[in-house]
Amino acid sequence: MASLKDKLITPVAQPATQPTSKVTVVGVGQVGMACAISVLEKGLCDELALVDVLEDKLKGEMMDLQHGSLFLKTNKIVAGKDYAVTANSKVVVVTAGVRQQEGESRLDLVQRNVNVFKFIIPQVVKYSPDCIILVVSNPVDILTYVTWKLSGLPKHRVIGSGCNLDSARFRFLMGERLGIHPSSCHGWILGEHGDSSVAVWSGVNVAGVSLQELNPAMGSDQDSEGWKQVHKQVVDSAYEVIKLKGYTNWAIGLSVADLLETIMKNLCRVHPVSTMVKGMYGIENEVFLSLPCVLGSVGLTSVINQKLKDSEVAQLQTSATTLWNVQKDLKDL
């Protein structure tokens, strides 16, 4: 007896069994789910996989997204505790990790996250040996280094979300001051994603007009307009949002989808993301910092040699030393 489906459909060829543009998000907390919905809204993948250790939360998030399938352009949404669900991913976004506890040092937090990553990263690589890993968990620069070490992948396929969001915050605040949309305000935050980030004032421009040429004191303590405050706001903004709502998630989710769009569509756009900078700007240790990088379908293909002032190079080197001092004491890498 033929089923309803058999009566409805005449098969012509076998449907595809392997995804061609699969994305996995590891960790379904606030950040992971913001990344997931941002990627789905942009229609960047033909399959989305979610992984976490919390099975009920995982199933609930998967079902909730699946129920929105009519409004999305993604064929398949899957989830599981077992990393087999991540097989054949093009990009794996890692948002998992432990939160900093009150009174806990940064090094202790990093060591706890290293222990989490020691479980996650080998599983990711086992099921998707050709994937690109995008690390989002904080402290992102150090955990990108940890991922690179644990994965055995070439450095162009291990990328940290880095200063992509810091630069977006900077451009938003710049736009607020000038009454111009952030996409027309150009400026770069480089170095560590965090307190020691570097604002490249010499490159800040609108329509190719250098703002530092109009205001030579821009970014310095002598600036009567206080533009230095804009960079301080960038550094402080995450702390402020966390204080107000407990975490940040929407902006980082959008930032990650922006990076994924460049990778999945091979756009060769330039983003400030965290990459291995040994040998650049006089940095001698294996640290990951944000520099302007060209991204495409094979990962991070090149770094733009930005002309930095001596003071900016010195700040980058300080960032590198700060990170190395934490990294060199990490165990079991």
Curated annotation (Swiss-Prot):
Substrate binds at R106, N138, R169, T248. PROSITE patterns: L_LDH. The keyword NAD applies. CDD domains: LDH_1. It is found in: Cytoplasm. It catalyses: (S)-lactate + NAD(+) = pyruvate + NADH + H(+). GO terms for molecular function: L-lactate dehydrogenase activity. Pathway: Fermentation; pyruvate fermentation to lactate; (S)-lactate from pyruvate: step 1/1. NAD(+) binds at residues 29-57, 99, 138. Its main location: cytoplasm. Its EC number is 1.1.1.27. InterPro entries: L-lactate/malate_DH (IPR001557), L-lactate_DH (IPR011304), L-lactate_DH_AS (IPR018177), Lactate/malate_DH_C (IPR022383), Lactate/malate_DH_N (IPR001236), Lactate_DH/Glyco_Ohase_4_C (IPR015955), NAD(P)-bd_dom_sf (IPR036291). One of its GO terms (biological process) is lactate metabolic process. The active site is at H193 (proton acceptor). It is an enzyme of class 1 (oxidoreductase). Pfam families: Ldh_1_C, Ldh_1_N. GO terms for cellular component: cytoplasm. The keyword Heme does not apply. PANTHER family: L-2-HYDROXYCARBOXYLATE DEHYDROGENASE (NAD(P)(+)) (PTHR43128), L-LACTATE DEHYDROGENASE B CHAIN (PTHR43128:SF2). Interconverts simultaneously and stereospecifically pyruvate and lactate with concomitant interconversion of NADH and NAD(+). Homotetramer. Belongs to the LDH/MDH superfamily. LDH family. This is L-lactate dehydrogenase B chain. It comes from Sceloporus woodi (Florida scrub lizard).
